[in-house]
A protein has these predicted regions:
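Short secondary-structure boundary/capping segments
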Residues: 33-34, 112-113, 176
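Hydrophobic membrane-insertion alpha-helices, especially the h-region
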Residues: 6-24
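Cytosolic-side transmembrane helix boundary signature
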Residues: 1-4
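Primarily the internal scaffold of c-type cytochrome electron-transfer domains
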Residues: 85-121, 194-195, 199
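N-terminal start-of-chain detector that recognizes signal peptides
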Residues: 13-17, 28-32, 48-51, 92-97, ...
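Sequence context surrounding c-type heme c attachment/ligation sites in exported
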Residues: 38-88, 121-202
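Aromatic-capped interface at the extracytoplasmic side
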Residues: 20-38
């Protein structure tokens, strides 16, 4: 009788822990504070690059229209411009010098991931961009169910999930958006996209 009581107590503790983790994950926005922008080894103000200089997303994130991940640019991509452009402020010059030093010493830049997905989930950027930029598809809806007025270009497609990156000093998940499974399923449903488990889960 005593071993059964001990086993029952252990099971209760384990189940309580699992329930607590699930509740924290569900009510955190996003889970465990991961939505806060992580600090990066080099400051990269999208406001300067995208809003002021009109550099398109796919110039730096070259894989975004071709594969699963958007990927961060290689140092060589940064030097395409910053071999000659020093930056307008002392702070900008210091950050650009970090890029040049990384290139000169053949040291990769250890960028911190901003958007995290569980290992069992895949998000194929190319498929989303192909769908939203396809002009032969009629009405399309954004992540919150808002009707998109026309087929967006690549940069506008990025804003559907990432928010207005051009006006963000620091990239972080879209304001008020946790990008949980339900968010993805809702967007798939409103756009009549399959919601089979295997579409997004490995």
């Amino acid at each position: 009788m005593v071993p059964l009581m001990v086993a029952g107590g252990v099971v209760t503790v384990i189940m309580g822990f699992i329930v607590a983790v699930l509740l924290i994950s569900w009510f955190s926005n996003p889970p465990f504070g991961l939505g806060n922008a992580p600090s990066q080894p080099i400051a990269f103000p999208h406001t300067v690059h995208v809003a002021e200089n009109n550099i398109q997303c796919e110039f730096c994130h070259r894989n975004v229209t071709k594969g699963e991940a958007a990927t961060v640019p290689a140092v060589e991509t940064c030097l395409f411009c910053h071999k000659d452009i020093d930056g307008g402020t002392v702070a900008a010059q210091e950050e650009i010098n970090k890029v040049r030093t990384a290139f000169d010493t053949d040291t990769p830049i250890d960028w911190a991931r901003v958007h995290r997905l569980p290992d069992h989930v895949r998000f194929i950027h190319e498929a989303h961009i192909r769908y939203f930029t396809d002009e032969t598809i009629g009405v399309k809806y954004g992540i919150n169910g808002e009707e998109l007025s026309e087929s967006p270009d690549v940069a506008q497609t990025c804003t559907i999930c990432h928010g207005d990156v051009a006006n963000k000093e620091v990239v972080q998940p879209k304001t008020g958006q946790s990008l949980k499974m339900g968010t993805c399923v809702d967007c798939h449903r409103v756009n009549s996209i399959p919601t089979d488990c295997t579409v997004c889960h490995k």
